[in-house]
């Protein structure tokens, strides 16, 4: 109840504007990749900090670019001696920044600020830890789940997915929801949607007992081409090659926007999803155009449920000019007030366990409870562990295209890709 009260109170505080700037203020720079909606919400988050720190203003510097470009911009500014005071760190950038030694270890500062790391979700916190060092305080995260259209389930008389469903259940439902709804002989509603990009099928691979890399992250052979991985890849690409339960673009390189638009228009019943799509879904649910539910990623019978989490955190450059203030700002942005205000935007789950639980208690849709349950089975992505992951991830769609477009056997395609990734990873050792 106390957490729920904090959440409501935080929203009220977040609605207030910051005090008017005065001469002689110290300006701190917060670097992130926020779009205009996120930047507006972050200004609400920053207002209480500026109010409680007279003489301090915080200026957001939003990149408005992709993650790779953002990383290079930040690293360049650090190398040039003009780092931001605080930066938003994506999980995929943790290895590059920690390997270069450009981030401040926050652990020695946290006791003085009263920051108890036990309050954070331990899996999410581990994304930003290296031994005893803490290089960022978790801001928020999402596990990957399934988003589904309740109306399509109801029209077909299919019960909503339960927490412990299997691949067999998913396939049976997807077939039942792939339909010719107007009787013209053409399928115009599909059970699900396929995507060749790894971040959207990682959870499917793991929930089938497979993986891309072996322990340590420096070899793919023996893991990507293992029997479990091959079977998971065969099953996932089989949505296209065997089951015909997905809309098929002529080259299968449809964008995320294409699949989302098909979902919003009632043409796709189930979609692999993260919390980051909730802000896009809300307008459709609030005006009654969609009734949406979420469910955990189903697992292969005999394999344990698993999913992947994607997270971001607040870091301080080792060369930050205002080190004390920078650490205070990072700690504030990752603490309960900021996370509660930010939760209203729906982009992510709060990384503080109590804040996430409070959000779930207040959520009348039941969505947040599903994300919380999914996080119990979540793993840290490889991108948070090895620096060359961007190159690995960029190569993986080629394997999927070999299978779905060129009709290469998944075992052959996986073996080819494993050898290719071995060579790529060897260059970085």
Name each model feature, range by range.
Residues 35, 107-120, 163, 182-191, ...:
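Short, solvent-exposed loop/beta-turn-alpha elements that line the ligand-binding surface or hinge
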Residues 48-120, 155-157, 261-262, 269-270, ...:
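Extracytoplasmic "Venus flytrap"/periplasmic binding protein-like
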Residues 57, 156, 238-246, 277, ...:
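Extracytoplasmic/periplasmic substrate-recognition and gating elements
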Residues 76-77, 83-85, 113-152, 189-191, ...:
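A structural signal for short loop-to-beta-strand junctions that line the ligand-binding cleft
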Residues 89-143, 204, 291-295, 360-364, ...:
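Hinge/lid segment of periplasmic solute-binding proteins
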Residues 131-139, 144, 169-222, 268:
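Extracytoplasmic/periplasmic solute-binding protein
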Residues 173-175, 218-252, 297:
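Glycine-centered hinge/linker elements that transmit conformational signals in sensory
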Residues 295, 344-395, 402:
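Long, aromatic- and glycine/proline-rich binding clefts that accommodate carbohydrate-like moieties
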């Amino acid at each position: 109840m106390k957490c729920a009260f904090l959440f409501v109170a935080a929203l009220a505080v977040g609605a207030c504007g910051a005090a008017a700037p005065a001469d002689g203020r110290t300006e701190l720079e917060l670097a992130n990749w926020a779009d205009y909606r996120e930047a507006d919400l972050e200004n609400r988050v920053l207002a209480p900090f500026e109010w409680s720190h007279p003489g301090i203003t915080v200026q957001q510097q939003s990149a408005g670019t992709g993650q790779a470009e953002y990383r290079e911009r930040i690293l360049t500014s650090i190398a040039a001696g003009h780092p931001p005071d605080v930066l938003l760190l994506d999980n995929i950038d943790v290895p590059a920044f920690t390997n270069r030694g450009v981030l401040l270890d926050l652990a020695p500062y946290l006791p003085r600020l009263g920051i108890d790391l036990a309050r954070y979700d331990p899996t999410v916190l581990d994304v930003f830890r290296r031994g005893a060092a803490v290089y960022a305080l978790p801001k928020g995260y999402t596990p990957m789940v399934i988003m589904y259209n309740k109306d399509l389930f109801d029209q077909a008389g299919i019960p909503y997915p339960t927490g412990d469903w299997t691949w067999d259940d998913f396939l049976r439902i997807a077939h039942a929801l792939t339909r010719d709804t107007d009787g013209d002989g053409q399928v115009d509603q599909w059970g699900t949607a396929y995507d060749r990009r790894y971040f959207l099928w990682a959870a499917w691979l793991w929930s089938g007992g497979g993986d891309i890399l072996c322990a340590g992250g420096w070899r793919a052979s023996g893991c990507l081409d293992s029997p479990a991985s091959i079977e998971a890849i065969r099953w996932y690409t089989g949505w296209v090659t065997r089951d015909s339960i997905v809309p098929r673009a002529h080259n299968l390189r449809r964008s995320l926007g294409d699949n989302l638009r098909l979902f919003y228009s009632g043409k796709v019943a189930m979609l692999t999803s993260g919390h980051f799509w909730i802000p896009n879904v809300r307008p459709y649910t609030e005006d009654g155009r969609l009734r949406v539910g979420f469910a955990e990623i189903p697992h292969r019978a005999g394999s344990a449920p698993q999913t992947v989490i994607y997270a971001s955190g607040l870091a301080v450059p080792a060369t930050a000019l205002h080190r004390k203030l920078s650490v205070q700002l990072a700690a504030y942005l990752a603490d309960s007030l900021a996370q509660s205000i930010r939760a209203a935007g729906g982009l992510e789950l709060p990384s503080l366990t109590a804040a996430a639980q409070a959000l779930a208690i207040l959520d009348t849709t039941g969505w947040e409870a599903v994300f919380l349950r999914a996080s119990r089975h979540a793993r840290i992505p490889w991108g948070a562990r090895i620096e060359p992951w961007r190159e690995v991830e960029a190569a993986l769609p080629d394997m999927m295209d070999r299978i779905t477009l060129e009709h290469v056997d998944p075992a052959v395609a996986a073996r080819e890709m494993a050898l290719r990734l071995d060579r790529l990873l060897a260059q970085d050792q």
